[in-house]
Amino acid sequence: MSIILGIDPGSRVTGYGVIRQNGRHLQYLGSGCIRTSEKDLPGRLKQIYAGVTEIITQFQPDAFAIEQVFMAKNADSALKLGQARGAAIVSAVNHDLPVYEYAARLIKQAVVGTGGADKAQVQHMVQHMLKLPAKPQADAADALGVAICHANTNKTLIALAGQATSAKRGRYR
């Protein structure tokens, strides 16, 4: 059983989602958005760091999963996104959490079944998969999608490790 914190980074709005994975079962623990109010980027990064630190303290996750930077058309936006990711990652590292990064297409594939899914499809499937009474906010749904992607990846790795162990045992008998 593990608790996974998923992060959808942004310099103005950073989504977060927390789930508990118990084998194949996923349980929703919480989600929301860290909304920055500072005008300057360093102030916003400080708010992201503080917000992620507060979430880590509250939920005590075992793993930290974050969306990778995509190549935006605007280089300035991509740099700011990278800095927002950095602020969140530093908080995780300061709490000795393992950090996992996933591409947006892989996250959408894990949640919706296609890497080209839009935000509404991700929201719908996150609501369905976690049995939520209402659709989560878009940024929170994306963050929950990151956590779900990590849980699915983690399950696959555990299954593969089990197969490798079984195969190894078979060879030595």
Swiss-Prot record:
The keyword Thylakoid does not apply. Binds 2 Mg(2+) ion per subunit. It is an enzyme of class 3 (hydrolase). It comes from Vibrio vulnificus (strain CMCP6). Coiled coil: none annotated. One of its GO terms (molecular function) is DNA binding. This is Crossover junction endodeoxyribonuclease RuvC. Belongs to the RuvC family. One of its GO terms (biological process) is DNA repair. The lineage of its organism: Bacteria, Pseudomonadati, Pseudomonadota, Gammaproteobacteria, Vibrionales. Its cofactor is Mg(2+). PROSITE patterns: RUVC (PS01321).
